[in-house]
């Protein structure tokens, strides 16, 4: 009996140590995990406001995509490039509610920039891996994101 408990405990320790090598969080079905965030590509085309509203309805804390470094941009690029015909997706970056005061819809700090000045809303041009101003009423695909 003692040997059985010892072996069982040993197997439990091995299992727990191996499970630590996997992601420490799980995203819902259909969402992809990266750096403590979950992402989902939507192939529907919507204007910026409708896409942001749609994202907020998908999961608690979900908003249009925010990008904080080139590694995250590359992750999104790889997830979206093959799926989307025009290679342009809405981002949560805007100054819709406060002119000239750019911010992410998820409230995150604007700590990474890759654009030239222009209109109120932004798209991520995937094939070129850069951001561009876009009329907020135009329709595009989008990516929703939430922090785990």
UniProtKB/Swiss-Prot annotation:
Disulfide bonds: 27-38, 55-144, 121-136
Quaternary structure note: Heterodimer; disulfide-linked.
PROSITE patterns tied to this protein: C_TYPE_LECTIN_2 (PS50041)
Keyword terms: Disulfide bond, Hemostasis impairing toxin, Secreted, Signal, Toxin
Gene3D superfamilies: Mannose-Binding Protein A, subunit A
GO cellular component assignments: extracellular region
Domain of life: Eukaryota
Location relative to the cell: Secreted
Signal peptide interval: 1-23
SMART domains: CLECT
Residue ranges annotated for the C-type lectin domain, each copy included: 34-145
Family: Belongs to the snaclec family.
UniProt GO MF annotations: toxin activity
Matching InterPro entries: C-type_lectin-like (IPR001304), C-type_lectin-like/link_sf (IPR016186), C-type_lectin/snaclec_domain (IPR050111), CTDL_fold (IPR016187)
UniProt function note: Interferes with one step of hemostasis (modulation of platelet aggregation, or coagulation cascade, for example).
Organism, as annotated: Daboia siamensis
Alphabetical list of Pfam families matching this protein: Lectin_C
Protein's name according to its UniProt entry: Snaclec 3
């Amino acid at each position: 009996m003692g040997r059985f408990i010892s072996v069982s405990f040993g197997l439990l320790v091995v299992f727990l140590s191996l499970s630590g090598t996997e992601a420490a969080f799980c995203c819902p079905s259909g969402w992809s995990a990266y750096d403590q965030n979950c992402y989902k590509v939507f192939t529907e085309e919507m204007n910026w406001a409708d896409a942001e509203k749609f994202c907020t309805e998908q999961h608690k804390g979900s908003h249009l995509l925010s990008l904080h470094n080139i590694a995250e941009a590359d992750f999104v690029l790889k997830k979206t490039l093959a799926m989307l015909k025009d290679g342009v997706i809405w981002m949560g970056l805007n100054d819709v509610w406060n002119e000239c005061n750019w911010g992410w819809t998820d409230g995150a700090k604007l700590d990474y920039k890759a654009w030239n000045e222009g209109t109120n809303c932004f798209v991520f041009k995937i094939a070129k891996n850069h951001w561009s101003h876009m009329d907020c009423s135009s329709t595009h695909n989008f990516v929703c994101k939430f922090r785990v």
